[in-house]
């Protein structure tokens, strides 16, 4: 019985964490990261790297720069795909850029 409860709690925790990760990346409305207009909305730099890893497995980060477009902050991450193609991926970082970080956010 104790083992069943442990397994159930582990599954519930895993599902909760998976749900949190998916809400940190917003690709609705055709947001594919191909331009400022189609920038992927993210809640953290970690979400940027997760998005890149999910969409361009085994790519390499060439550079990352913070810039503004129409008064809004963006991260532009330059990657080299595994087949050697250079590509820029645009992220809307307005949810967290220059916002106060609390100790609870770091856990």
Regions found by a protein language model. Give the residues of each.
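Solvent-exposed, low-complexity, repeat-rich "mucin-like" stalks and linkers
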Residues: 34-50
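C-terminal motif of bacterial Sec signal peptides marking the signal peptidase cleavage site
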Residues: 16-19
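Short, compact, well-ordered microdomains
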Residues: 66-107
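Bacterial N-terminal signal peptides that target proteins for export
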Residues: 1-9
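Charged, amphipathic alpha-helical segments
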Residues: 54-65
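Bacterial signal peptide processing site
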Residues: 21-23
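Intrinsically disordered, low-complexity, charge-dense segments enriched in Lys/Arg
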Residues: 25-27
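Extended, charge-rich alpha-helical interface modules
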Residues: 32-34, 106
């Amino acid at each position: 019985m104790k083992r069943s409860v442990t397994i159930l709690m582990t599954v519930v925790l895993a599902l909760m964490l998976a749900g949190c990760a998916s809400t940190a990346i917003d690709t609705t409305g055709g947001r594919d990261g191909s331009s400022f207009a189609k920038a992927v909305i993210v809640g953290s730099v970690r979400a940027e790297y997760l998005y890149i890893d999910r969409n361009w497995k085994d790519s390499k980060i060439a550079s990352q720069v913070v810039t503004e477009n129409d008064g809004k902050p963006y991260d532009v991450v330059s990657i080299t795909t595994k087949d050697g193609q250079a590509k820029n991926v645009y992220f809307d970082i307005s949810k967290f850029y220059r916002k106060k970080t609390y100790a609870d956010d770091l856990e």
